[in-house]
Amino acid sequence: MKKTILSWMLLMGSTISMNAAVNVNRIEPTDWYVGMKDASLQLMVYGKDIKNADVTVDYPGVRVDSLVRLDSPNYLLVYLNLDGVKAGEMTLNFKQGKQSKKVKYLLKNREMAGDKRIGFSNEDVLYMLMPDRFANGNPKNDAFKTMRDKTCDRTAPSLRHGGDLEGIRQHLDYFNQLGVTALWFTPVLENDSPNDGKNSTYHGYATTNYYRVDPRFGTNDEYKKLITEAHQKGLKVVMDMIFNHCGFEHPWVADMPTMDWFNCPEWLSPEYQTPEHQKKIGTMDGAATVNDKFQQTSYKLTPVLDPYASKIDMHETVDGWFVPSMPDLNQRNPHVIKYLIQNSEWWIETAGIDGIRMDTYPYADRDAMAHWMKVLGEEYPHFNTVGETWVTEPAYTAAWQKDSKLSEKNSYLPTVMDFAFFDRINSAKNEETDDWWNGMNRIYNVLCYDYLYPNPKSVMAFIENHDTDRFLGEGKDTLALKQALSLLLTINRTPQLYYGTEVLMNGTKSVTDGNVRKDFPGGWADDKHSAFTAEGRTNAENQMFNWLSRLLHWRQGNEVITKGKQTQFCTQKGVYVVARQYKGKSVMIVINGKNEANELNVARYAEIIGNAEKATDVTNGRTVLINKNVKLRPRQAMILEF
């Protein structure tokens, strides 16, 4: 009798399962584009017990190549072939037992062919900003009761302050006035993570939805509108992405699609999903208190290229989590990297971005990232991506650039970040220049290694960013700042500025990261001081803004700087000179690295000056006679054009 009852219960359970409604809660990508070189489309279907559904498609030319049933019962990967398919609305037919469901899915035409998309280059100057800290154009989206972090508090340096995309859009003319040509925002995608009272994910580096702009920044449509209007004003937009990790509140974490979706997934196993451990995970500094199964990255990037690297060092670098609240994605899983590749393509097609900045580039799997770059390069041959490669040695950085002879593997990464220049210029600012090692010798020496780079002009140089101390520290040394900017904007590099440099924003990380990510003055309606207008800026701010703006506008379209041959001279008596030459035109950057008055011995630079008798100092418009020695003020920077 008991056996009969048990059999009946099992039969009824099976029948109920077979007749249960088909649940399709979400499909990613949310829509797609026809005419891509890679005709394969991965659809990640989310829904309770969707794993065993069968799928057919009603649409001319679309073929279901495969259904991949993952470990979790709540995911199904549908691989479609769209070769030769035209745009339109197709129907996806899901069937489970006797139940079925039809879901409409839109296939769109592309706005332009991939080879028509032109990325940022060394002709641009990128202006990096943090949306939460730049301007609040819509106070109504500062906080939402439906999100885990409901706080907006400008008095707390590491909580959300309310800046948004609308605030950026309202100040597009400001960027034109300044003279920059491209904007790089820190990530704008949804970060639906809690705050612990001290820290939050206002920075955007803990993604919880790869297809949705964070509502506190705006909507997908507002992001597209911002980019469209930026393009109308001659500004490019670079999107910050993260393939290395996601946020802990991403649905993948609570319900892993496969057991190898993340690196070191042991910490996500059920026995560690207790309120106590959740609390530890939610704290940004939780690494010191978590259980021994947690593996944090060593932050040591050298093992990735080290020919003698141990397996344990590689594991700690690549597989360890960046912080406890950011689970480390396993790009070696082919379904993970396919998802991420499609996501980057979707944002290019949907929003019209002009470039990608990839966060924590070497922390992700090297081969998978190279595959992504190769695919993206084939689809968008003139697009540009810059990778964050935070090691201060040129040999390391150069090995990550596309076609490098220093690596046995091609990364296909067009642009790398120049942490070597950043490191040297921040040391030089505190030193007087001698004839060997200190001061501007650091810049001379680091540029000597440009022979290591396949393409030096596609190396992104900077003097500060959101992860470093401000160049000014806690001070206001404008002489050192002008020297650094004079070099940054004229050497054979792609230059990047950090918001607020033009109005002397300062700060160090010794206080908190938020101290180098302060709100831009005037970005909030109740600000008493606005740096967006000449009337609102102080005299010191206007002097710096005007000086930099003059230089930025001069750089626009200047082929001597973007195409010219570069020549540098060993320092002599504290003077450092770099020259650029193109089609009979010359520019000499002259840096007095001494704290006292000095002199430029023009005879030493005859190979550049030739028969020229006078030049224009771009920094102030004055005429300078160069047929005789030139007097230099303490720590002066001159940019001589002739």
Could you tell me what each predicted segment is?
Residues 1-26:
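Bacterial Sec-dependent N-terminal signal peptides
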Residues 37-97:
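Immunoglobulin-like IPT/TIG beta-sandwich domains and homologous Ig-like subdomains
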Residues 245, 343-345, 349-454, 476-478, ...:
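Active-site-proximal helices and loops of the catalytic beta/alpha 8
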Residues 456-476:
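Active-site clefts of carbohydrate-active enzymes
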Residues 21-51, 109:
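Beta-strand/beta-sandwich contexts
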Residues 127, 183-185, 237-239, 356, ...:
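Hydrophobic faces of well-ordered beta-strands that scaffold small-molecule active sites
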Residues 135-345, 350, 369-378, 389, ...:
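Substrate-binding/active-site clefts of carbohydrate-active enzymes
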Residues 20, 98-102, 106-125, 176, ...:
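Carbohydrate-interacting/catalytic domains
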